[in-house]
Amino acid sequence: SVGEQVYFTRLSNGLTIHLIPKEDYYETYGIITTKFGSVDTRIIVNGDERQYPAGIAHFLEHKVFEDENGQDYLKKFVHLGSESNAFTSFTKTSYLFSTTSKIPENIQLLLEMVSKVSFTEKSVSKEREIIQQEIGMYQDSPDYRLFFGALDNLYPGTPLADDIAGTRESISDITIDNLRENFDLFYHPSQMHLLVI
């Protein structure tokens, strides 16, 4: 036994929650994860196969941080005295915060952030430019190029060979409809897991 207590529940909407109390920790950490990563570009929905451009999970990660009024959730977390971030991997996308106060408010804000999203042509176009610049920065890193070059040689023609952020070309192909469809599929509570430590 490692002496840890873990509380688990699954809500009626399907969201799974794990709580790991740490009495000797001053800071609280919350992370919500959806089972949607960069390899999820070919999806079967109601027997119908759909193909999406590489980088869509990462693009959606960026857009989830913007509320319906175009305001940045990062600033809302700062207002609560917490830090927040997000990341996309091959198999998941996660959003997180760390704080020393206002824990219920931070959890509520995290849940609010991943429960609704708003897209406009202008905001998607702006984000597309930001992500394309980000891709350029990644490609300037020798370690990054070596890692994804190895994956491309090991798994040619598969989503594992694609950059998690996509390519400049694939990002240009992502539409508002693509983003909305993937949000509706993967940001449902039944596809998500909340962990609070």
Q: What label would you give each PLM region?
A:
Residues 10, 21, 67, 72-197:
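Charge-rich, well-structured scaffold segments of protease-associated domains
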Residues 1-72, 180-197:
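His/Glu-rich zincin catalytic helix
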